[in-house]
Amino acid sequence: MLNPKMKWFALLLLTSFQAQAHTDQLTQISFQIGLLHPLTGIDHLLAMLLIGMTAALTPKTKLSLPLVFSFGLLIGTLATGWLNAAMNVEPWVVGSVVVFAALVWGKTRINPPLQVGLVGIFAIAHGAAHGMALPSTPDVASTAGLLIGSLLLQSIGFAVGQRDCLRKTLALDTRMTS
């Protein structure tokens, strides 16, 4: 059993800062910034989760929505400078959350090709917003981190959506058998 001082020391070790003894520290930091960025803004966090949920709830677009969103995110991130001058992306980001929420809660039904197109447009806006928020010009490491973080959130949303589908299916089965 650890004495109380050792417990505090162990806790301190767990919370220590990253060692900066590596030659590729800028790449590591850049990757971490990209990875954490989708988690730090509520609009981006909600959008990624809702995309995953929408994909789970829409059988015809299960794979295409996350892939189109990720590709649009990449395009938007890489075209940040041009998109920044061409449009104000923040209203598009907020609008995407509203549209994705309507799709999840079933208040809006649109055909799958239009749904995929909307997701692509909103993804480009999200990518531009992410690219503008990064501390420097988007590089390979930060962009890879951004895509991985976004796909992780979409996967969580997909799992939640699948669980919801299963729950609804089981509820229908119990109603039919009783």
What kind of feature is each model-predicted range?
Residues 2-11, 17-178:
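Membrane metalloprotein/metal-transporter helix-bundle signature
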